[in-house]
Amino acid sequence: MKKRKILSLIAFLCISFIANAQQKLTSPDNNLVMTFQVDSKGAPTYELTYKNKVVIKPSTLGLELKKEDNTRTDFDWVDRRDLTKLDSKTNLYDGFEVKDTQTATFDETWQPVWGEEKEIRNHYNELAVTLYQPMNDRSIVIRFRLFNDGLGFRYEFPQQKSLNYFVIKEEHSQFGMNGDHIAFWIPGDYDTQEYDYTISRLSEIRGLMKEAITPNSSQTPFSQTGVQTALMMKTDDGLYINLHEAALVDYSCMHLNLDDKNMVFESWLTPDAKGDKGYMQTPCNTPWRTIIVSDDARNILASRITLNLNEPCKIADAASWVKPVKYIGVWWDMITGKGSWAYTDELTSVKLGETDYSKTKPNGKHSANTANVKRYIDFAAAHGFDAVLVEGWNEGWEDWFGNSKDYVFDFVTPYPDFDVKEIHRYAARKGIKMMMHHETSASVRNYERHMDKAYQFMADNGYNSVKSGYVGNIIPRGEHHYGQWMNNHYLYAVKKAADYKIMVNAHEATRPTGICRTYPNLIGNESARGTEYESFGGNKVYHTTILPFTRLVGGPMDYTPGIFETHCNKMNPANNSQVRSTIARQLALYVTMYSPLQMAADIPENYERFMDAFQFIKDVALDWDETNYLEAEPGEYITIARKAKDTDDWYVGCTAGENGHTSKLVFDFLTPGKQYIATVYADAKDADWKENPQAYTIKKGILTNKSKLNLHAANGGGYAISIKEVKDKSEAKGLKRL
């Protein structure tokens, strides 16, 4: 790690004439200014401007604690008749005075284990304000970090006699908007992020909420104006604003609730089964609340605030075993309804250890059988893939969902037609790793009971990565997917996996907040509406032009692109869904939807029909030295160029919405004086996601850093370009400049 640090600590004593004075913090480039003060009621307030434009109007900060429990000892007695005194103890939002302020500047460059660039700069100015509340004799710290691309702040609770153990009733962090901005939003929900995005004015959210809430396997929407982070907005005066959080550890996931009369968002935490929102023990802190802002949409995509606000890697040897993975899997045929996760249709109830599958009749549709898996292994080996995922391999799928069943899977017992040892031997001979699947059916207590045994089973049978799932309502019953208890579980699973040198791809878990910096074996997350929904009726055409501005702000997504046969009835006649994308855009998603874990999600037979287009999936890199955001507008288009790790090869991808998009590309990011062979995979002139999704063109030619190229993406279309350095002049023979 390269470091360049400048620390300047300036302590201001709590002198009466400056105690509640206004404090200003500027970004290193002076474009952002954050102003903090305590108002006349002793409430902490802040505001934020960017190039003299208001980003956050004056907004208050603080928390509300739960009333103290009625059960007490003689050592902790409070007079029950003194209700004023009792209620005041729940107040951590006013009655404060400034006790101390400290400022600092920090500048370092660090290297991620994997990522969108080789090095990341972490440069900010900091203000830490210690606030004292005389009526309760307690202190808190609000720490602000102002980067060139945005602001992060969090609450810190020092250990003290008057604040040791406490329960959070609600966090009241406000984000006051300066207008009725355009928002790219999904409904606030304690249990799912798998919604299509709605584009509307803030004032329209209430009226559109009912339509925006579509059915899901587990969902708990909480308000007519509640939305989830990361929330993307665009102002009428040309600012792009993103609200999210970073380093979500031992705390509840934050949503936002909008006061649509005053255009003020306020934090809304996910409750536990009792309705409480956080059990805390000092010293402790909240996650960071983040505000990314720019007058250029590309800078939202380029921001690394979320990663920079997380702690450095805690796995000492991570670089030796955490590696990007390109994989295929026994999955899409089941998603479309052609195949089945379950082994038999005869059982309506399964009891693990008691149900005898040898006495049942196979349904003939079970996809995770040895012969079929070997076929996938052969395909992966022939085309340079790293791994094969197999879902539905283990006993219990016949009654796995919707029964609030505790002991649902044991994660080690295969179905009769899945030979674990033979598949391990076969894959090893072919140089292919197997990817484990741990669907928990949201029975988290059961998963934790079996976790060590399940991870050891993986280690014994050649699995070094796992796709985990949490479909359904959480057990223990009443807990939510995004509450403090579950967030602690997700991190426990990742840390435990690291003990076995296992990489984790968590589905249905809390949306990422940059924790992959600290634990890079968290190599993938779903936490949004992915490709599977294309088989359940389809995603909105603009979906992939929004996700990088929202969900991917927190970390990579296992979006599972690469569907070439977009008509699902070709797989299953009963499924009339259509993937809302052209083939060219499916290729582009390997560049625009960043992840070190990339799946070629279609079945082998569909790739064999389009091997020329499939070549891009085979070629595209997973790990990057450099990323350039060439053009971007949320809801319309995104074009990204990435330089492959330790090479001078580049890959470009463009995804477009319903209006299509024409790019005027300039390749000045290429090395001067070098020639490159470019292979351009583009929509044909008559391509259209609905009418002609498989129409594409492929052309080769020479590029230099002075080249320019116009390319058109169709409705729901895109394009992809592989750009490889010419190392021998003979490689370019016969090719013309593009």
Swiss-Prot record:
Q: What catalytic reaction does the record list?
A: Hydrolysis of terminal (1->4)-linked alpha-D-glucose residues successively from non-reducing ends of the chains with release of beta-D-glucose
State where the protein is found. Answer: Periplasm
Site location (Substrate)? E194, W331, K467
Q: In which pathway does it act?
A: Glycan degradation; starch degradation
Q: Which GO terms describe its biological process?
A: starch catabolic process
Instruction: Please provide the record's keywords in A-Z order.
Output: Calcium, Carbohydrate metabolism, Glycosidase, Hydrolase, Metal-binding, Periplasm, Polysaccharide degradation, Signal
Query: Which amino acids does the record list as binding substrate?
Result: P215, N216, S217, H437, H438, E439, H507, E508
Q: Where is the active site?
A: E532
Q: Which GO terms describe its cellular component?
A: periplasmic space; plasma membrane
Q: What is its main location?
A: periplasm
Q: How does activity depend on pH?
A: Optimum pH is 6.5.
A single MF term (Gene Ontology) = alpha-1,4-glucosidase activity
Quaternary structure note: Monomer.
What PANTHER family has UniProt attached to this entry? GLUCAN 1,4-ALPHA-GLUCOSIDASE SUSB, GLUCAN 1,4-ALPHA-GLUCOSIDASE SUSB-RELATED
Function of the molecule:
Glucoamylase that hydrolyzes alpha-1,4-glucosidic linkages, alpha-1,6-, alpha-1,3- and alpha-1,2-glucosidic linkages during starch degradation.
Q: Which family does it belong to?
A: Belongs to the glycosyl hydrolase 97 family.
Name of the molecule in the record: Glucan 1,4-alpha-glucosidase SusB
Recorded source organism is Bacteroides thetaiotaomicron (strain ATCC 29148 / DSM 2079 / JCM 5827 / CCUG 10774 / NCTC 10582 / VPI-5482 / E50)
